[in-house]
């Protein structure tokens, strides 16, 4: 397997399609050079070729493709997320303002801190948040300088690095030095697509989440794939792939995979398969703790926490942190977005307590005039704080916020059980949820994706994917994404959690 894992077909648990942009050199992409007429034509042709293959998302094989993110998303209705850097807004939201993220690049002599911050601001971060991402080049290691990468004649040049212990040690030593220089470092983001083969080594050695081109690709695929844990098995063409992933992940779950902590509001109900609080919604272990006094009504209103609520929330988070194997904390109510800032201040672990955090990924993935549906249990309850929630997710510009449309499910037959704290009949409710979304999409023909804000809506995600044929993001796609950054990669890596690499 080549070290440039992003282009290796064995790096994924799903099918990939490649299209080459003729005449677009690595040096041009690295420098963010303005595309010539012929290069722009070649780029359009490559995008068209991928669309013709029916791909569900488009990414790139070079982190510097971020320079052309805006151009490509105008060329297609398919979500385009060309660089691992598009994960940055999610990371910025998960961690405290004082905490930093290390960004590894091939060569920081031609992609320095200023260039990184400029790109991050362009994709939606504030200057203050962009400065939290600290660039670290590897040009001092043989093979990583821009000139050496540009001179690679074929991927066989890189085939040896996977077995090079010397190279691994040099990379780990560089990260260790960066950690000493930045004690507030909490995660690693690999801008370089040459590096995912070393992600497991970084996770094992540093003990922090590592986000790369593969975590991004897996996340994008999940938004358009039947969920093998609780999905509908509607689309047989993707189900076999999803089940293959499930079999691999079941093997992982029996081993030493990390756990996710779930911060629960003070609200008792019987969760359905697919709900955040339902243990079988995941292929890994979860731990739950209740913030006593932080009720559903309080979360909806989003008022500042009382002293008692703050104490209860912090206590629950502390217990989750202390639980064995927990590597991150989510929440069981989308309205907890109102308290995302509070949660991340209380914890040294990444906090991602609302599905709303994914809104920026949607805004960045599609053309500026394309729109999204946000399904919620009650539209009137979400509306008052909706703009503030979007801003917390780094969707700050009024024109971008206007692309998100609330769709309340309060009148769907049978869904009132959610408000009553009763068991939901998923089979009964599904047709109503689908009909509601289809009608809304028909009224808004520019709708390109759906976000399920409510943590009791993921059971309907597969039915929506099938009916609308567009990506659906929910609390489960978010939790799986963050978990993957701390998990032994089942397709390649160093097997540091003793997981099975046997594909069933």
Curated annotation (Swiss-Prot):
Q: What is its EC number?
A: 4.4.1.3
Q: Which domain of life is it from?
A: Eukaryota
Which reaction equations make up its catalytic activity?
S,S-dimethyl-beta-propiothetin = acrylate + dimethyl sulfide + H(+)
| Molecular-function annotations in GO | dimethylpropiothetin dethiomethylase activity; racemase and epimerase activity, acting on amino acids and derivatives
By its UniProt entry, which InterPro entries does this protein fall under? Asp/Glu_race
What keyword terms does UniProt attach to this protein?
A: Lyase
Family label: Belongs to the aspartate/glutamate racemases family. ALMA1 subfamily.
Function text = Mediates cleavage of dimethylsulfoniopropionate (DMSP) into dimethyl sulfide (DMS) and acrylate. DMS is the principal form by which sulfur is transported from oceans to the atmosphere and is a key component of the ocean sulfur cycle.
Q: How does it assemble?
A: Homotetramer.
**What protein does this entry describe?**
Dimethylsulfoniopropionate lyase 5
What is the source species? Emiliania huxleyi (strain CCMP1516)
